[in-house]
């Protein structure tokens, strides 16, 4: 999509897009940027998807219609789950009229597991996964993101957490795109964390460095994510614009997922890649889903290739 000064219609669309993108993808990372014009050539489809959600829902997400509280889940893709990876760290984020604050953050060691599913799930879900998703580390076995979001919110509430208005999930690759824009940070032990090494650091190097002290590894991960958030908050308006542009790539790769408890907002989000929804309505899609059930954190080292020669599905 080209944006030119002579094409007022496209210019208005670009401005709407930047407003909405900041509301939907960066609501948990940076304040809303009001008016920016930006050009892109390779993400027309993603822009149309996000524009379809509408500014009214963007205001809902950003807390302009009442304070919102979200669980931000950091998915560790070293151990694959249906939505990307197991939860390695989390934050509880409050947004009030675009003002963002972190109420609490921690690693998965802080999260309390249950023996049975914390809420009623569809029969096909129970048949596939049983009660395994009652444990946080297995709570997102289903590739249908709303399933994971509902379980996460209920598990959080059961351990005494405040009521949540939604969930967002990201992974280390999303962080790499952010660091490419805002610059490197320094880890707790003095290492320089950059866009080029953050994925390897979080999915491989930390496991070697803290081989005998997993608790310290989890603390180091939380510290790293907290510093990234702080750097984004302190970035200039120009940098924030570049962050929005950079995050179109991980959005397209299904690395940024969102769920809202607001029925209207969720209905709109579910029609986009942001919703992580597996649709039951034709024309829908086949999807190859990878699950690591060994707890070995080996997915970082694996290359996968999927070839489909013939595929059909019976009516039942």
Q: Model segments located where?
A:
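Non-catalytic, solvent-exposed segments at the cell envelope interface
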Residues: 2-316
């Amino acid at each position: 999509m080209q944006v030119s000064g002579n094409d007022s219609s496209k210019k208005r669309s670009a401005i709407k897009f930047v407003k909405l993108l900041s509301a939907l993808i960066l609501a948990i990372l940076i304040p809303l940027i009001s008016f920016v014009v930006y050009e892109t050539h390779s993400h027309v489809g993603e822009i149309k998807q996000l524009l379809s959600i509408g500014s009214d829902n963007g205001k809902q997400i950003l807390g302009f219609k009442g304070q919102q509280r979200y669980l931000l889940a950091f998915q560790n893709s070293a151990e694959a789950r249906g939505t990307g990876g197991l939860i390695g760290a989390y934050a509880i984020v409050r947004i009030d009229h675009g003002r963002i604050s972190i109420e609490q953050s921690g690693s998965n060691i802080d999260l309390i597991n249950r023996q049975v599913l914390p809420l009623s799930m569809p029969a096909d879900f129970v048949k596939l996964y049983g009660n395994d998703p009652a444990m946080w580390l297995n709570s997102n076995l289903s590739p249908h993101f709303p399933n994971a979001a509902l379980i996460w919110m209920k598990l959080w509430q059961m351990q005494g957490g405040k009521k949540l208005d939604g969930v967002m999930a990201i992974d280390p690759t999303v962080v790499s795109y952010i660091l490419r824009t805002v610059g490197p940070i320094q880890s707790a032990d003095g290492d320089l964390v950059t866009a080029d090494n953050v994925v390897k650091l979080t999915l491989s190097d930390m496991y070697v460095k803290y081989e005998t002290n997993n608790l310290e590894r989890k603390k180091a991960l939380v510290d790293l994510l907290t510093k990234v958030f702080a750097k984004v908050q302190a970035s200039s308006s120009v940098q924030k614009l570049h962050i929005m542009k950079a995050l179109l790539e991980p959005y397209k790769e299904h690395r940024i997922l969102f769920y809202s408890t607001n029925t209207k907002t969720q209905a709109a989000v579910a029609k986009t890649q942001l919703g992580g929804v597996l649709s039951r309505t034709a024309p829908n899609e086949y999807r190859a889903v990878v699950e690591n059930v060994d707890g070995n954190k080996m997915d970082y080292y694996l290359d996968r290739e999927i070839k489909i020669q013939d595929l059909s599905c019976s009516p039942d």
